[in-house]
Design a protein with these regions (language model features):
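Long, charged/polar, soluble alpha-helical segments
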Residues: 1-132
Length: 132
């Protein structure tokens, strides 16, 4: 962390906590829609991915992780439901693990966001194939 005052740090941490709660809600909604094959699955996954992207940005700002460049191994061809479930598990680990290792928690958060982006693209491709 940099020359940030404790007030600024507390403010960022409270914003991060709120963003993580919002991301958790959106991932739960995406999981629900994906498991029920709802018509707006792709949109639900996209909202969850965007919430995780925002949380990831706040996480990076809060803990000064500019130098951490996680390597994400994308799983192409994986069904959306599995990717959403795995994202939820990674988000859970990020929320619980940030007291132990902020770098590991950040990697989990980035991985979850990238899995959701892959799930969204897979869902869009699936929708486009149905239209053809």
């Amino acid at each position: 962390m940099s020359d940030r005052s404790s007030v600024e740090q507390e403010y960022l941490e409270s914003k991060l906590e709120s963003a993580l709660d919002d991301a958790w809600s959106k991932v739960n909604i995406a999981l629900d829609k994906t498991s029920k094959s709802s018509a707006d699955v792709a949109m639900g996954i996209w909202f969850a991915a965007e919430a995780l992207e925002y949380s990831s940005l706040l996480f990076n700002l809060t803990y000064g992780l500019e130098d951490v460049k996680p390597t994400i191994k994308l799983r192409k061809g994986e069904v959306a439901l599995v990717l959403v479930k795995d994202s939820m598990e990674l988000l859970k680990r990020a929320r619980e693990g940030r007291k132990r290792s902020v770098a590991d928690a950040y990697v989990n958060l980035r991985t979850a966001a990238d899995f959701l982006k892959a799930a969204h693209l897979e869902q869009v491709r699936k929708s486009n194939k149905k239209r053809e």
